[in-house]
Amino acid sequence: MPVHSREKKESNHEEMEVDFAEQEGSSSEDEDTESSSVSEDGESSEMDDEDCERRRMECIDEMTNLEKQFTDLKDQLYKERLNQVDAKLQEVMSGKAAEYLEPLATLQENMQIRTKVAGIYRELCLESVKNKYDCETQAAFQHWESEKLLLFDTVQTELEEKIRRLEEDRHSIDITSELWNDELQSRKNKKKDPFSPDKKKKPVVVSGPYIVYMLQDLDILEDWTAIRKAMATLGPHRVKTDASSKIDKLQHNARSEDGRLFYDGEWYSRGQAITIDKKDEYPTSAVITTINHDEVWFKRVDGSKSKLYVSQLQKGKYTVKHA
């Protein structure tokens, strides 16, 4: 709108210049009659000034009108843009805007994919934990079984040793039991005759070297029993008994040397397949995994691991052979 007002002013100036040129032309033509028309020229100049002033006021009014229209249009455009922004904001807040729905759909798709992956990972973790639990349970049960067998063998060995010692004590005490019974019988006789006069013992005449016992009869019996036990322990009878018991217990020749097992004339090493046989049970196939000083670890076909003690092989509780 300022451009239009400038063009308007230029057109007014051109018109004024044209009028001024015409006036100069007319004045040149009437130079000869200049003196006679002085009054007429004064009146025409006054009319030109009034016309210029009037045109100037019209231009100013037109410029003011154009500026007002421009301001109104600018306000109207601002309000329309503001209404558009408010409408778009309302669509976003209500969840209907395209700029909001497209990224939202992408986020929902990503969420579904990640949720599915997390579910699969959860199932795999649960399966892994379950397998680990089953493995630990099976290992604990097998360890309990092996420890139970070992404890049973240990207790049985201790009880057999105690029984053997009691039998030896019984055989060694039989000799002194007669003296013990005689002592008790003599005490009973003394209690039966409390009013009998005390008989004086005659001094015993001993020839040669002799030992004077200053102990009581019970102390002598205890010492005699201890001597008999020591003699039975160190005597040939005890040696024969120990040898026979060891021969009875060690029915098989079994030992471990340098990471290998020697059993009944055959050598067994790690990684060899063997067959384990126990009384009243079916034979089991296994593979040797570790051979220690006093135990042998093996792995069954089902993957479970167990161990055998060399003492169990020596006693014949288990037998092994090459598969």
Swiss-Prot record:
Residues 16-51 have a biased composition (Acidic residues). Its main location: nucleus. Residues 1-52 are annotated as: Disordered. Gene3D superfamilies: 1.20.5.1500. Residues 1-15 have a biased composition (Basic and acidic residues). InterPro entries: Sds3. It is found in: Nucleus. GO terms for cellular component: Sin3-type complex. The keyword Lyase does not apply. GO terms for biological process: negative regulation of transcription by RNA polymerase II. GO terms for molecular function: histone deacetylase binding. Transmembrane segments: none annotated. Keywords: Coiled coil, Nucleus, Repressor, Transcription, Transcription regulation. The keyword Transcription applies. It holds the Pfam family Sds3. Residues 50-81, 156-178 form a coiled coil. Belongs to the BRMS1 family. Involved in the histone deacetylase (HDAC1)-dependent transcriptional repression activity. This is Breast cancer metastasis-suppressor 1-like protein-A. It comes from Danio rerio. The gene is brms1la.
